[in-house]
Amino acid sequence: MEKVSFPVANTQLVGDLYGAAESGCRPAVAIIGPMTYQKEQAPTEYAKRLADQGFVALVYDSRYRGESGGEPRAWENPMHKVDDLKAAVAYLKSRDDVDPTRVSVLAICQGSSVAFRAAAERDDVHALATIAGHYRDQEGDIEWLTEAGYAARKAQGEAAKAKFEATGTVDYIKGVDQTDMNVGMPGDFVWEWYQPWADRGLWENQYAVMSDADLLSYESISAAKQLTSPWLMIHGDNCFLPGAARRHMDAVPASTKTKTVWDETPHLAYYDQAEVIDNATQQVVEWFRSA
């Protein structure tokens, strides 16, 4: 593994690069993870496997998280994540050991909605694969949070952002909690997965409240309508918001090459279950090679 860094908007992003070639050029993959992710979580599991298959694989912390710079910390800003991912693609294309015509993007959970916009705005992404995607449209957001919850969170986020812009003060809540629903990612099952990372000091259980002003103003279905990069979707009825996944697939232009792998695998199994990750990685490898 090689520790790397690259700039975006006067901020340094820090990443881990797997599979660097000693000679020649290899295909490469920029990997983005779920909401509030840090690179050592699910993205690294996929990066190691992709490197074993001959890819240069980059995982990185988005701005405001992990080893990467940016203030305020724990600010979840999807549009900034779009720019971060585009910068990661550009970094890979600049490397001597990477074939610049074969740089693809792999996205996990809510990273998928970011990847759509990044791929739509950069028409040189070789191929896109999304795993257990959290696809963003208002219908899905209301299904996720309820109509009242969506409105309350957005209003709370907008008030917190106005406070930050006026005073520089950042209001924080937890990222996850076992019982408290006023957190960035509510739900006991989410807490069960993330809290052990926090207990080991490998993930910060913190969420800037003003994030919701940006997060809940973001959608990805308009980007799906512009997608030209070949797209592999791995999803299923036991993954998050399957209806939103179907709406995004339906929105993609008919001229865009697509493939759907739909099964009964539980959403969080794609984060840490070795056999599930092995199988998903093989699907991704075959897709990127054939695109």
Language model features with spans:
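Catalytic active-site module of serine/aspartate enzymes centered on a nucleophile-bearing elbow/loop
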Residues: D263-A291
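The serine-hydrolase catalytic nucleophile loop
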Residues: M35-K48, S62, A244-A245
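Conserved alpha/beta-hydrolase
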Residues: R49-G69
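Alpha/beta-hydrolase-fold enzymes
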Residues: F116-P196
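Alpha/beta-hydrolase fold nucleophile elbow
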Residues: D97-C109
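Short beta-strand/loop motif that positions the catalytic acidic residue
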Residues: L227, M233-H235
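N-terminal cap/lid segment of alpha/beta-hydrolase-fold proteins
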Residues: M1-G24
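Catalytic nucleophile-loop/oxyanion-hole region of alpha/beta-hydrolase
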Residues: K39, R65-P100, A274-N279
